[in-house]
């Protein structure tokens, strides 16, 4: 239950009872009415701009209209107090009874509390990671992996039908470079002294096992073949080996995909899917033959000073038209992008989200143009760019990895600090902002370490249940009707403040899903944990506020209901971030 949605309905119903509003209803835009928490919690529980929004079309002073609305809202039994502020904002304070009923609902719904139908089952494709299958995942992939996975989890929680997808870039020239790199490791496994890995190839030790596997399978057979024979053989096995490694890296980070889509699929059967996509754009009038003027600055890889087959992407929002077929008849990488988008669109996705690194910023306009051209405006494509992650240890930059050759691997980071720390911290800053990740900071057991602070809140909730069992040995906690127990008992202002913080969860879910910003969940969880820890600490000085009071069984049981609600939301939120909710922490 979203209390802000509930009161939006109540406020609009109150407006419908005002004569002048009814008379001019067709001229009023109720969609502009906002209902949200006041900026200052001391002003109330719910605030609305209704009077500000409607005063002009009604020809009234906002403050005067606010007073009329207030009179109607005062008739609501769940409104304890309502007042106007500033030029016409309305602040509402809710009754204790309303909070108690809402808490009972939270307890009854458990981990379902906060789930939304705002997505209405709409199909959404979220593509993330999509790292080249040329080596282990590095820390640069880590942020996009976590952001994409958490966003997909969030959208699913908000009622969207989500597909998590990984695009395997296995058709480009980098795959031939990989195969040649593996061939050197294969020769090395046969006993050759290969010396230093040539420039332009992948030097990492991670290719050694692949070379050894080939030596076991083929012996010296491949060594005697010309490159055109051994290259496709090694290419296939190298891709498979790299994807096994990448999948293991993703699993270590608790990142999952529903679909792994191979770029080679687009090039199969004479590049049938690419040809179909280009034919479709041709039919729609977006394809022509021509030569592009040389762009300013550095020339892109696909630019040629001769006639090519071009996508008229400037007609759909791009800066320049894009080559689809080169003068030699070969397809550009961009042509595969077009075919891949069309494939997703043909699979029924009208909303697609691409999670890319900040270095792909130049791709945004062209991808958006593809979406408009292929779908004729029927599909929405959003590109979310993740800024760089810099690694530190006690404030000092972390050195590169010997195993990978020139970068820090994702597995190294996860093995050192744990996947929960990695995942939560990758979400503890907006993805469009750079992130500094300090190994020392993320392993601290303090309030300054967000993942510890939030997980400790859940563990503390569980410890309170164990404490209650010790205080009341005959109590069968598992069979308690905690939702019923809170009625008429939970009433202390400090307790109600905690209930109010829990009650924000459904609104946070919907807002974060609609903004496609999973970091909002991490921020909210920290705030909830802070409120909970703060209330727990008050109990150390004020025994009457302790969650378990061995002299008051009824109150203790009711407060277990409050703890249950906190724990449920923490667990749900941590689940969205892909982070564990431990029952104990040592």
Curated annotation (Swiss-Prot):
GO cellular component: cytoplasm
Its EC number(s): 6.1.1.19
Subcellular location: Cytoplasm
UniProt cross-references to InterPro entries, sorted A to Z: aa-tRNA-synth_I_CS (IPR001412), Arg-tRNA-ligase (IPR001278), Arg-tRNA-synth_N (IPR005148), Arg-tRNA-synth_N_sf (IPR036695), ArgRS_core (IPR035684), DALR_anticod-bd (IPR008909), Rossmann-like_a/b/a_fold (IPR014729), tRNAsynth_Ia_anticodon-bd (IPR009080)
Highest taxon above the source species: Bacteria
EC main group: ligase
Keywords carried by this UniProt record: Aminoacyl-tRNA synthetase, ATP-binding, Cytoplasm, Ligase, Nucleotide-binding, Protein biosynthesis
Reaction(s) catalysed by this chain's protein: tRNA(Arg) + L-arginine + ATP = L-arginyl-tRNA(Arg) + AMP + diphosphate
Motif window: 'HIGH' region: 131-141
GO molecular function, one term: ATP binding
One GO BP: arginyl-tRNA aminoacylation
PROSITE patterns the record matches: AA_TRNA_LIGASE_I
Chief place where the protein resides: cytoplasm
Entry similarity comment: Belongs to the class-I aminoacyl-tRNA synthetase family.
HAMAP family according to UniProt: Arg_tRNA_synth (MF_00123)
Assembly and oligomerization: Monomer.
Protein name: Arginine--tRNA ligase
Record organism: Rhizobium rhizogenes (strain K84 / ATCC BAA-868) (Agrobacterium radiobacter)
Gene coding for it: argS
């Amino acid at each position: 239950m979203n209390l802000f949605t509930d009161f939006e309905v109540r406020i609009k119903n109150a407006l419908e009872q005002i004569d002048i509003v009814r008379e001019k209803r067709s001229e009023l835009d109720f969609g502009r009415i906002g209902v949200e928490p006041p900026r200052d919690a001391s002003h109330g529980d719910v605030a609305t701009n209704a009077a500000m929004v409607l005063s002009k079309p009604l020809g009234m002073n906002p403050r005067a209209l606010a007073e009329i609305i207030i009179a109607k809202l005062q008739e609501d039994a769940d409104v304890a107090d309502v007042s106007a502020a500033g030029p016409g904002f309305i602040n509402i304070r809710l009754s204790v009874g309303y909070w108690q009923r809402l808490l009972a609902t939270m307890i009854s719904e458990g981990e379902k509390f906060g789930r939304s139908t705002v997505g209405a089952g709409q199909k959404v494709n979220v593509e993330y990671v999509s790292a080249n299958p040329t080596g282990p995942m590095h820390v640069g992939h880590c942020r996009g992996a976590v952001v994409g996975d958490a966003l997909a989890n969030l959208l699913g929680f908000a009622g969207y039908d989500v597909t998590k997808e990984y695009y395997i870039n296995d058709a480009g020239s980098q795959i031939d470079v990989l195969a040649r790199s593996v061939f050197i490791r294969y020769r090395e496994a046969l006993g050759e002294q290969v010396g230093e890995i040539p420039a332009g190839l992948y030097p990492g030790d991670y290719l050694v096992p692949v070379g050894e596997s080939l030596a076991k399978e083929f012996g010296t057979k491949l060594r005697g073949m010309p490159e055109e024979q051994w290259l496709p053989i090694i290419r296939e096995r190298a891709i498979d080996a790299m994807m096994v490694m990448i999948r293991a890296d993703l699993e270590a980070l608790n990142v999952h995909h529903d679909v792994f889509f191979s770029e080679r699929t687009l090039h199969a059967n004479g590049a049938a899917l690419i040809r179909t996509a280009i034919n479709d754009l041709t039919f729609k009038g977006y394809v022509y033959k021509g030569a592009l003027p040389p762009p300013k600055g550095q020339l892109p890889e696909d630019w040629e000073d001769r006639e090519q087959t071009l996508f008229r992407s400037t007609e759909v929002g791009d800066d320049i038209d894009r080559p689809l077929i080169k003068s030699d008849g070969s397809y550009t990488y961009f042509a595969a992008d077009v075919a891949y988008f069309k494939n997703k669109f043909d699979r029924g996705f009208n909303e697609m989200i691409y999670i890319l690194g900040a270095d792909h910023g130049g791709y945004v306009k062209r991808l958006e143009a593809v979406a408009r051209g292929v779908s004729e405006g029927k599909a929405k494509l959003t590109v979310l760019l993740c800024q760089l992650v810099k690694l530190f240890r006690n404030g000092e930059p972390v050195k590169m990895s010997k195993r990978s050759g020139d970068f820090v691997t994702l597995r190294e980071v996860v093995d050192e600090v744990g996947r929960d720390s990695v995942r939560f911290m990758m979400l503890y800053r907006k993805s469009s902002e750079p992130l500094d990740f300090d190994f020392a900071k993320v392993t601290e057991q303090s309030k300054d370490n967000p993942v510890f602070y939030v997980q400790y809140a859940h563990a503390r909730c569980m410890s309170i249940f164990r404490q209650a069992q010790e205080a009341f040995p005959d109590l069968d906690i598992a069979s308690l009707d905690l939702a019923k127990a809170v009625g008429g008992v939970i009433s202390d202002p400090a307790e109600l403040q905690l209930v109010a913080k829990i009650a924000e969860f459904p609104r946070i879910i919907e807002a974060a899903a609609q903004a496609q910003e999973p970091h909002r969940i991490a921020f909210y969880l920290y705030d909830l944990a802070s409120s909970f820890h703060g209330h727990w600490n008050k109990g150390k000085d004020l025994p009457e506020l302790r969650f378990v009071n061995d002299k008051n069984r009824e109150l203790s049981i009711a407060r277990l209901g409050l703890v249950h609600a906190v724990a449920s939301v923490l667990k749900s939120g941590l689940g969205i971030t892909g982070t564990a909710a431990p029952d104990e922490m040592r």
